[in-house]
Structures are given as C-alpha cells and as structure tokens.
From Swiss-Prot:
Residues 163-192, 369-392, 543-565 have a biased composition (Low complexity). GO terms for molecular function: zinc ion binding. It comes from Candidozyma auris (Yeast). It is found in: Nucleus; Cytoplasm. PROSITE patterns: ZINC_FINGER_C2H2_1, ZINC_FINGER_C2H2_2. GO terms for cellular component: cytoplasm; nucleus. The keyword DNA-binding does not apply. Transcription factor involved in the cell wall damage response. Required for expression of numerous cell wall biosynthesis inhibitor caspofungin-responsive genes. Plays a key role in adherence, hyphal development, and virulence. This is Cell wall integrity transcriptional regulator CAS5.
Length: 679
C-alpha cells in the first residue's frame, strides 16, 4: 500500500518553495466559485518559473506527448475541446503557494476543474495525483505532476486496480511484484508503451497491465518459483460495472499440452513426478512425436492406463485424427495394475481379440523393448506403434475396418452382459442339443430294451422295464437346465421311426399323457395293442369324444338343474273353474277376461307359486284368477292375463318384418328399437 500517496503535499518539503511566499487568499474558499480570481492570480506568478520536472534517472519528463484523453476510464467526463500544453512550465506556481483548496473525488464528474485554463494544464495543481512506485518515489522530494488522483484520497480499493507513475514504463520487470493483469478496468497508461502486454484469449474490451510479462504475484506461490501459464490462470477481482465472464484455460486451448498433463497424471501412481523426464519434442504443428525408446524411465504408459488399447477405430484409417481424439482417458492411478484393472467394468477386459486381458502381469510389458506411446501421432506413426506393440504383446490384434461383429468372440468374457448374450445365443440351439443328448442316452441301451419298446404286447412290462432307466436319465438331463420345462424329456417325441409320427393321431389328448408321465417321469407311450404300436383311430376317438362330451355336458347339466329348481317352485295346477275365477277376481272385467282365455285353444299351462314363498305386500290388492299373482292395479292384471295365452294379436306392419306380439306395448317397443319409429 505504500505505492499510493497517502499525505498531502503540504506535509512534505518542496525544493522549489520560497520561504517568503504567502498563502493563496483562496486557499480556504470554494474553488468552483472563485475560478476567475484564481486564474488571474496564477497569471501573476509568471516570474516564479519552476524548472521542468525530471525523473530521478536523468530522463526528460515522460508525460510529454501523452494523450490522457484516450486512456481515461469511461466515468471521466470533461470537455473534449480543451487543449493541454505540457511544455508550458512558466505558469506553474509552487504547490505550497497555491494550497489545496479542494480535492475532487474520482466518483464525481471532472468537467469543472478542467475549465481553469484553456492553454495550460499545469494550472490545475495538486488536485489529483498518480501514485508512485517504489523505485521512483522518494520521501524527500515531492514534485508535482499532472495528476488524476486526489492527494488526500484513500488508496484505491476497486476503482483503479493499476496506477502507475512515469517511471513504471521504463522500470525493470523484477523491481517490484506486479499486480495481476486480469482486471477489467483499462489501465491509464496502456498506450503507446504497452507493447509487452498479452491479451487474455476469448475476452473483448479488456486490457492488461503494462508490466505483466511475468506473473510473480500469484497468490498460492507469492514470491516463489515461476508458475507455469499452462496450469495456473490469472484471477482478478471482478469490477462493479462489469459482469463476470469465465475464462477458458490455456490447457484446453492447447491440445498437446492438455495431453501432456493427462499423461503425467496417469503415471503418478507408478513413479515420482519429480523423476519423470519427458523424452518428447514439440513440433511446430502442435503434435508430440514419440522418442525411440517410448519409455519414461522404464514405465510403460500402456500398462499405467487400464483403458489404453492400441487398436484404432475405423475412422482413423483415413488419416483424420484430431488432437482430442488421441488424448488418453484420465484414470485413477494405482501401484498395483492388476488390482486397479479389476475395479473397472470393461467389456473388453478378457477378450484377446480386443487387445488382450488387462489382468495380465505387467512385468513382461515393463521389460519389453518397445511399447506404444499414447500421443498425438499421425496415421503413419500409429501404424508403426501398432506393429511394434504387436510384437511385444502376442495377444494384441488391431481392429480393422473389415472386422464385423461375428468375428468378435464373446465366449472368453465373464461380465454380466456377455453372460446374458451367451445364454441367449445358446438357447437358439438348445432344442437340437437336448434332442441329440437324449438320442445318445438311448443309443447306449441294450437292444432288448429297445425291442420291448416296439414289440412288447404288454404295456405294463415295457413301462416297468423302462421306468428305472428313465429315472436315472431324466435326473442327468435336468441337472444342468432345471429351469426349462417346455423342452423336458416328457414332451420330446423319440425320433426312431417316421411312420410312428405319421400314425400319431391329431386328436390325441396331450394333457392325459403329461399327467400320466408326471408321476414316474417315463417317456410318453401311447396305448399299445398286440398287433400294432398305436391303437386304431376308431377305437381312439370314442375315448376322446367321451372326454369332450363329459366336459361339455357339465354346463348343460347346471343349466337344466337351475331350470328345474325354478319349475319346482311353481306347482303345476289344473285350470280353475268358473266359481274359483269369480272368487279370485276382484272385478268382473278380470273374471270375464280370464274365462275367455280358458275357453280359447291358445291357453298355456298354469303354474302357481307356493304360498310360503310368496311375500305378502299390502299394496298389491289384486290377484290373477289363474296363477294367483298379485298386482297393485286391475289393468296390470289384465295385461298379465295375456301372458297365459299364446295368441299374439299385435303384428308389426313394417316390410320384411311381420313379427307378432301378445301385447301392444311390446309392439311399440319393437317399432322404436328396431325400426326407429315413435308412435
């Protein structure tokens, strides 16, 4: 913080101050209100000429020829028509004589102080000052200069991140620790002496400090060794008026450097990084060329990275290999390569056609004479690396463009995905394998047993002779595939004779065979006779028809039993006599209508409900004189009496219909529903 001037010039001794000079009568008054009088007094002091300011190394004033109007920040507002003559030193009075009437803040508009004089900039004395650095600042001499920062102001915290004096431009870069160059405020002295500055990539409207050629002010290594620009980015404070923008790292812009850092990170587990000497040269095109040894002090890079494989994708053969495509993967390093490789799920970990097993011992590869260097090589270098590596590893085979999925073997792998694929592949030919296995088991039996299968007239003897052997064979056949039920031996038909399959009837009930063979695990054998293997179709069909008839007769029997129950509820009764009709009928109309029905030929049999099942309802006061059914109204009884007659006096008159109904309301419902007519 000593780079900034903390005290006013009145507290320091000035070599050009005259002791007999009086203070300015306007020292304690407002400068803005007394500007005309102040200018007249400054013109009176022409006799006291101050010699031109020199720097302390004998050089002339470095402010000569500089245009501050182009380098000021955007918050300075002043009249662009003003001209400042820096060579006019005759109107420069002593600062002690002028005094410090007012100090203008940086945050205020600076248009008013610049109206002091139209010809001289030096008349605006000590109202602002630029801070001095360590080499040029001397406490015994305090020369005034054209300044932009107030003398009594506090050290700038965020407004001016870089304030340089005139000697900063010619001072050595290692005279003082420079500030960071990533601030977004434009420096006051950027041009024309800012040739050494380096712009940050990807930033616009940003200018770095003048003396930022070497970055020694980095916070983690402050004052220490030199920091590589590839690994550390310059971090600065975000200004108030600007938004924060994320800067891209230089390592991401240089693929060869990023590849080099990734290679070093992969080898940290096997050797010390301080003893690692990279034997590679940087070419002008940005690619790394491998050395002849292709080893880093005996460390094989292909063994350090478990995901490293030398086979080339089909797109590499055309010669289009970018820097990012050749960058190896950043994998965690470990000292034991076998244990580290076993921690990763790799589909090609056990396949030698993909580059060999990753669980191999690394001693053979560590001692080999040549191994592939995972760098940004051209297509020719990749072919050389793959050929040299194939001699070191016999199991390594590069994947070419003409290789297909069928040429890749999956039987050597042990992960879950390959197990599922291998199981699905084996299920396609499982039926043929099971059939051949059963044929081999049956081929080893004696001819006597086979003769019993085809020629024995007693099925009991044949089944009893074959059952113990089938128990042993079925136990062996199901030991490996117990979960497969559809391909079991009980459902496989022996392929001994083609005529046997031809004579097999289509109407054979397979459910009976499986149920019969499930108890003793014997092979299905159809019923046998003394003359032929299969029974005749005529004798076989009645059994099947009986089984089918028994299955279909069950629902019919249930329907008949339900109908019988309903009929049992109604007791068949003889037709009532006229006297009984008169007693049962509540009105004469009902009695007459019932007698007419009984006298007609279309009468139906009458079924009367049992009295104990009938529920008494006091609202239903009217009875049917024929079946004793109860109704609430007499018209309901008349409508009901029509159901006792088979006569259908109402007929549909629509063409191609002619249906008849015993009630008129049924005819209306028919016309509305079928013919869509409303009567």
């Amino acid at each position: 913080m000593e780079n900034y001037l903390m005290s006013s010039p009145s507290q320091h001794h000035h070599p050009h101050q005259q002791p007999h000079q009086q203070h300015n009568p306007y020292a304690n008054s407002d400068t803005l209100t007394n500007l005309p009088n102040l200018e007249n007094d400054l013109d009176f002091s022409d006799s006291e000429v101050v010699p031109p300011s020199k720097d302390y190394q004998g050089s002339p004033n470095v402010y000569d020829g500089l245009d501050f109007s182009t380098d000021m920040a955007t918050d300075f507002v002043y009249d662009s028509t003003l001209e400042f003559d820096l060579d006019d030193h005759k109107h420069m009075p002593d600062p002690a004589e002028m005094g410090h009437s007012k100090h203008f803040s940086v945050d205020r508009p600076l248009s008013a102080p610049f109206y002091l004089s139209q010809n001289s900039r030096t008349n605006f004395n000590h109202s602002r000052n630029i801070s001095l650095d360590d080499t040029a600042y001397k406490r015994s001499f305090h020369k005034h200069s054209a300044s932009l920062v107030s003398n009594a102001a506090e050290p700038p915290s965020g407004t001016f991140a870089h304030s340089h004096s005139s000697n900063t431009l010619q001072s050595s870069s290692d005279s003082m620790p420079q500030l960071s160059s990533s601030v977004s405020n434009p420096s006051l002295l950027d041009s024309p002496h800012s040739a050494m500055q380096t712009a940050t990539p990807g930033r616009r409207h940003k200018s770095s400090s003048v003396s930022s050629h070497t970055n020694l002010y980095t916070t983690p290594l402050r004052g220490g060794t030199h920091v590589s620009p590839l690994t550390h980015t310059k971090v600065g404070k975000t200004p108030i008026g600007k938004t924060h923008r994320r800067n891209r790292s230089r390592a991401s812009l240089e693929p060869s450097s990023a590849h080099l850092l990734a290679t070093v990170a992969n080898m940290k587990g096997t050797s010390n990084a301080s003893n690692l000497a990279l034997s590679s040269a940087q070419t002008p095109s940005g690619h790394l060329t491998a050395s002849t040894s292709q080893h880093f002090h005996g460390i094989n890079l292909s063994e350090a990275n478990p995901f490293h494989n030398e086979f080339v994708s089909p797109g590499v053969g055309s010669g289009h290999l970018s820097d990012h495509d050749a960058t190896p993967l950043n994998t965690p390093a470990g000292r034991d390569h076998s244990s580290m490789a076993s921690q990763f799920f790799t589909p090609i970990s056990h396949n030698r056609s993909f580059g060999g097993s990753l669980l191999e011992s690394s001693s053979s590869a560590m001692g080999s004479a040549a191994s592939a260097f995972p760098s940004n090589l051209s297509s020719n270098d990749l072919s050389v690396a793959s050929s040299s590596n194939s001699s070191a590893r016999p199991g390594m085979a590069p994947l070419r463009r003409n290789d297909t999925l069928d040429s890749i073997t999956i039987e050597d792998q042990e992960d879950d995905a390959c197990k599922q694929l291998r199981k699905a592949k084996s299920f396609t030919s499982f039926a043929e394998q099971r059939m051949s296995q059963l044929m081999k088991q049956r081929a080893g039996k004696s001819s006597k047993d086979l003769g019993n299968v085809f020629t024995d007239s007693t099925p009991d003897a044949s089944s009893s002779g074959r059952s113990p052997r089938k128990d042993s064979s079925s136990g062996n056949s199901y030991s490996k595939s117990a979960s497969v039920d559809l391909l079991s031996a009980s459902l496989v038909v022996p392929d001994h004779n083609d005529s046997y399959l031809k004579s097999y009837p289509a109407s054979m009930d397979l459910a009976s065979i499986t149920n019969a063979s499930s108890g003793n695990h014997a092979s299905p054998s159809p019923p046998k006779t003394s003359s032929r293997l299969m029974p005749p179709i005529e004798s076989q069909e009645p059994s099947s028809s009986r089984s089918r008839g028994s299955s279909t007769s069950k629902p019919r029997q249930t329907l008949a039993s339900a109908a019988a129950k309903k009929l049992n509820k109604k007791v068949p009764q003889t037709y009532p006599t006229a006297s009984q009709i008169q007693k049962a009928a509540t009105t004469e109309d009902i009695a007459k209508f019932a007698e007419s029905i009984l006298q007609s030929e279309n009468k139906r049999p009458i079924f009367v409900k049992k009295q104990e099942e009938e529920v008494y309802d006091p609202k239903k006061k009217h009875k049917c004189p024929l079946c004793l059914a109860r109704f609430q109204r007499p018209e309901h009884v008349k409508r009901h009496l029509k159901s006792h007659s088979s006569e259908k006096p109402f007929q549909c008159e629509e063409p191609n219909c002619g249906r008849r109904f015993n009630r008129k309301d049924n005819l209306k419902a028919h016309l509305k529903k079928i013919h869509h007519k409303n009567l």
